Protein backbone atom coordinates (compact mmCIF):
# COMPACT_ATOMS: atom_id res chain seq x y z
CA UNK A 1 0.00 0.00 0.00
CA UNK A 2 0.86 3.62 -0.33
CA UNK A 3 1.49 6.03 2.53
CA UNK A 4 -0.37 8.85 0.77
CA UNK A 5 -2.21 9.79 -2.38
CA UNK A 6 0.55 11.01 -4.71
CA UNK A 7 -1.97 12.71 -7.00
CA UNK A 8 -2.58 15.33 -4.32
CA UNK A 9 0.18 17.87 -3.66
CA UNK A 10 -0.72 19.82 -0.50
CA UNK A 11 0.29 23.44 -0.16
CA UNK A 12 0.68 25.13 3.25
CA UNK A 13 1.12 28.92 3.32
CA UNK A 14 1.29 31.00 6.48
CA UNK A 15 3.29 33.48 8.51
CA UNK A 16 6.73 32.43 9.74
CA UNK A 17 6.38 30.68 13.09
CA UNK A 18 2.70 29.77 12.66
CA UNK A 19 3.41 26.03 12.93
CA UNK A 20 3.50 24.76 9.33
CA UNK A 21 6.78 22.91 9.80
CA UNK A 22 6.10 21.98 13.41
CA UNK A 23 2.99 20.04 12.39
CA UNK A 24 5.10 17.95 10.01
CA UNK A 25 7.90 17.49 12.58
CA UNK A 26 5.35 16.13 15.03
CA UNK A 27 3.95 13.75 12.39
CA UNK A 28 7.48 12.71 11.42
CA UNK A 29 8.10 11.47 14.98
CA UNK A 30 5.19 9.06 14.55
CA UNK A 31 5.61 8.13 10.87
CA UNK A 32 9.05 7.21 9.49
CA UNK A 33 7.96 7.74 5.87
CA UNK A 34 7.81 11.54 6.30
CA UNK A 35 10.95 13.41 5.26
CA UNK A 36 11.34 17.16 5.77
CA UNK A 37 13.84 19.03 3.62
CA UNK A 38 14.90 22.67 3.57
CA UNK A 39 13.94 23.97 0.11
CA UNK A 40 16.55 26.76 -0.18
CA UNK A 41 19.36 24.23 0.42
CA UNK A 42 18.49 22.28 -2.72
CA UNK A 43 20.50 22.58 -5.89
CA UNK A 44 20.15 20.76 -9.19
CA UNK A 45 22.21 17.77 -10.16
CA UNK A 46 25.49 18.87 -11.71
CA UNK A 47 25.58 22.20 -9.85
CA UNK A 48 27.63 23.18 -6.86
CA UNK A 49 25.78 22.78 -3.63
CA UNK A 50 25.75 20.50 -0.67
CA UNK A 51 22.28 19.03 -1.15
CA UNK A 52 20.80 17.92 -4.45
CA UNK A 53 17.30 16.73 -5.34
CA UNK A 54 18.68 13.20 -5.79
CA UNK A 55 20.01 13.26 -2.20
CA UNK A 56 16.42 13.32 -0.91
CA UNK A 57 16.21 9.70 -2.04
CA UNK A 58 19.78 8.41 -2.11
CA UNK A 59 20.28 9.02 1.61
CA UNK A 60 17.24 6.87 2.43
CA UNK A 61 17.19 3.10 2.80
CA UNK A 62 16.24 1.51 -0.55
CA UNK A 63 12.95 0.11 0.82
CA UNK A 64 11.89 3.62 1.98
CA UNK A 65 12.71 5.51 -1.23
CA UNK A 66 9.51 4.71 -3.10
CA UNK A 67 7.03 5.24 -0.25
CA UNK A 68 7.58 8.68 1.22
CA UNK A 69 5.95 11.99 1.93
CA UNK A 70 8.54 14.65 1.14
CA UNK A 71 7.81 17.95 2.88
CA UNK A 72 9.63 20.85 1.22
CA UNK A 73 9.96 23.53 3.89
CA UNK A 74 10.40 27.13 2.74
CA UNK A 75 9.33 26.08 -0.75
CA UNK A 76 8.42 29.69 -1.54
CA UNK A 77 12.14 30.56 -1.51
CA UNK A 78 12.87 27.58 -3.74
CA UNK A 79 10.27 28.74 -6.27
CA UNK A 80 11.38 32.40 -6.41
CA UNK A 81 13.24 33.19 -9.64
CA UNK A 82 17.00 32.80 -9.14
CA UNK A 83 18.80 33.84 -12.30
CA UNK A 84 22.54 33.23 -12.53
CA UNK A 85 25.06 35.39 -14.35
CA UNK A 86 24.69 33.21 -17.45
CA UNK A 87 20.93 33.79 -17.54
CA UNK A 88 19.97 30.36 -16.18
CA UNK A 89 16.89 30.39 -13.94
CA UNK A 90 17.95 27.94 -11.24
CA UNK A 91 14.47 27.90 -9.73
CA UNK A 92 12.95 26.73 -13.00
CA UNK A 93 15.57 23.98 -13.30
CA UNK A 94 14.83 22.70 -9.79
CA UNK A 95 11.11 22.80 -10.56
CA UNK A 96 11.82 20.73 -13.70
CA UNK A 97 13.48 18.09 -11.51
CA UNK A 98 10.50 18.09 -9.13
CA UNK A 99 8.07 17.83 -12.03
CA UNK A 100 9.55 14.46 -13.06
CA UNK A 101 9.10 13.22 -9.50
CA UNK A 102 5.58 14.61 -9.05
CA UNK A 103 4.51 13.10 -12.37
CA UNK A 104 5.18 9.66 -10.89
CA UNK A 105 7.84 8.78 -13.43
CA UNK A 106 10.61 6.25 -12.95
CA UNK A 107 13.74 8.26 -12.26
CA UNK A 108 17.34 7.05 -12.17
CA UNK A 109 19.78 8.83 -9.89
CA UNK A 110 23.52 8.33 -9.90
CA UNK A 111 25.32 8.53 -6.57
CA UNK A 112 28.80 9.75 -7.45
CA UNK A 113 30.18 9.89 -3.90
CA UNK A 114 32.52 7.06 -4.85
CA UNK A 115 33.75 8.26 -8.26
CA UNK A 116 35.52 4.96 -8.98
CA UNK A 117 32.31 2.98 -8.48
CA UNK A 118 29.23 5.22 -8.88
CA UNK A 119 25.99 3.62 -7.72
CA UNK A 120 22.68 4.06 -9.51
CA UNK A 121 19.25 3.99 -7.94
CA UNK A 122 16.11 3.58 -10.04
CA UNK A 123 13.12 5.00 -8.19
CA UNK A 124 9.46 4.55 -9.04
CA UNK A 125 7.86 7.83 -7.92
CA UNK A 126 4.21 6.71 -8.17
CA UNK A 127 3.89 6.35 -4.38
CA UNK A 128 5.81 9.46 -3.37
CA UNK A 129 3.88 12.51 -2.24
CA UNK A 130 5.13 16.07 -1.91
CA UNK A 131 4.00 18.87 0.39
CA UNK A 132 5.12 22.46 -0.21
CA UNK A 133 5.27 24.72 2.87
CA UNK A 134 6.31 28.35 3.11
CA UNK A 135 5.23 31.87 3.89
CA UNK A 136 4.48 32.63 0.21
CA UNK A 137 4.29 36.24 1.34
CA UNK A 138 3.81 37.79 -2.12
CA UNK A 139 0.97 35.39 -2.87
CA UNK A 140 -0.73 35.98 0.48
CA UNK A 141 -0.28 39.76 0.29
CA UNK A 142 -1.77 39.83 -3.19
CA UNK A 143 -4.82 37.84 -2.11
CA UNK A 144 -5.16 40.08 0.95
CA UNK A 145 -4.99 43.32 -1.07
CA UNK A 146 -7.61 42.44 -3.66
CA UNK A 147 -10.37 44.95 -3.41
CA UNK A 148 -13.62 45.69 -5.13
CA UNK A 149 -15.11 49.13 -5.77
CA UNK A 150 -18.85 49.61 -5.96
CA UNK A 151 -20.36 52.76 -7.50
CA UNK A 152 -18.78 56.11 -6.67
CA UNK A 153 -17.64 55.11 -3.23
CA UNK A 154 -15.19 52.32 -2.97
CA UNK A 155 -15.45 49.64 -0.38
CA UNK A 156 -12.45 47.45 0.19
CA UNK A 157 -12.97 43.78 0.89
CA UNK A 158 -10.03 41.89 2.25
CA UNK A 159 -9.83 38.41 0.80
CA UNK A 160 -10.21 35.61 3.30
CA UNK A 161 -6.77 33.99 3.50
CA UNK A 162 -8.45 30.65 4.02
CA UNK A 163 -10.12 31.04 0.64
CA UNK A 164 -8.96 28.82 -2.15
CA UNK A 165 -5.64 29.67 -3.74
CA UNK A 166 -6.10 29.23 -7.46
CA UNK A 167 -3.69 27.74 -9.96
CA UNK A 168 -3.33 31.23 -11.45
CA UNK A 169 -2.38 32.64 -8.00
CA UNK A 170 0.34 30.01 -7.67
CA UNK A 171 1.73 30.79 -11.12
CA UNK A 172 1.56 34.60 -10.91
CA UNK A 173 2.51 35.22 -7.30
CA UNK A 174 4.06 31.96 -6.13
CA UNK A 175 6.35 31.62 -9.19
CA UNK A 176 5.34 27.98 -9.51
CA UNK A 177 5.36 26.37 -12.94
CA UNK A 178 1.85 25.80 -14.27
CA UNK A 179 2.52 22.06 -14.62
CA UNK A 180 3.23 21.86 -10.88
CA UNK A 181 0.59 24.40 -9.83
CA UNK A 182 -2.08 22.32 -11.57
CA UNK A 183 -1.30 19.40 -9.25
CA UNK A 184 -1.47 21.38 -5.99
CA UNK A 185 -4.56 21.05 -3.79
Model region roles, listed by residue range:
Residues 17, 45, 62-67, 87-94:
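Conserved P-loop NTPase motor core
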Residues 13, 22-26, 31, 76-185:
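Canonical AAA+ ATPase core
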Residues 2-3, 62-63, 120-122:
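Surface-exposed acidic, glycine-flexible loop patches that form ligand/cofactor-binding
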Residues 1, 54-60, 98-107:
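Short, well-ordered amphipathic alpha-helices
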Residues 35-68:
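Short glycine-rich substrate-engagement loop in P-loop NTPases that contacts/grips substrate
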Residues 7-11, 67-69, 129:
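Residue-level preference for the first positions of well-ordered beta-strands
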Residues 2-37:
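Walker A/P-loop
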Amino acid sequence: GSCADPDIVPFNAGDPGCGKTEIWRTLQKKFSFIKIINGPQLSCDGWKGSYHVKDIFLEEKPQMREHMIVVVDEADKLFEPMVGSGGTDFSRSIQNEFLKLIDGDQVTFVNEDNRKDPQTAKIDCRNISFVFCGSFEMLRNNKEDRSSAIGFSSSTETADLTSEVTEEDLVLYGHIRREIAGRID
